[in-house]
């Protein structure tokens, strides 16, 4: 009887202790500020679960153009995968994250194409001119 009651309590309480992680994806130039990895002024966390592609390592991240994938847990952005990108290939971006205040990951648009997605967390494909996004559309 005690075992089944404990198992039942565990099944009831277990979901309360779990947190939902939301995946993100962004492209941008990294910087280090006071020991914190930043992209567009937003902090990201590198930890023992972060994987670096090809030749890239943590020491290379200052000023490098990268694609980052990760999860947001309890408001903290954990990087899970980092890949260096060729600066010549940055005319298009695939982004996944929140559209808030006409921005996604700190990027604004030149054509207001983020407006239909305001308040949503989604995957987008956008053109990029080196400063601003344009022609953003939901990724298929």
Sequence positions of predicted segments:
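Short, flexible, surface-exposed loop segments at domain boundaries
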Residues: 2-43, 48-140
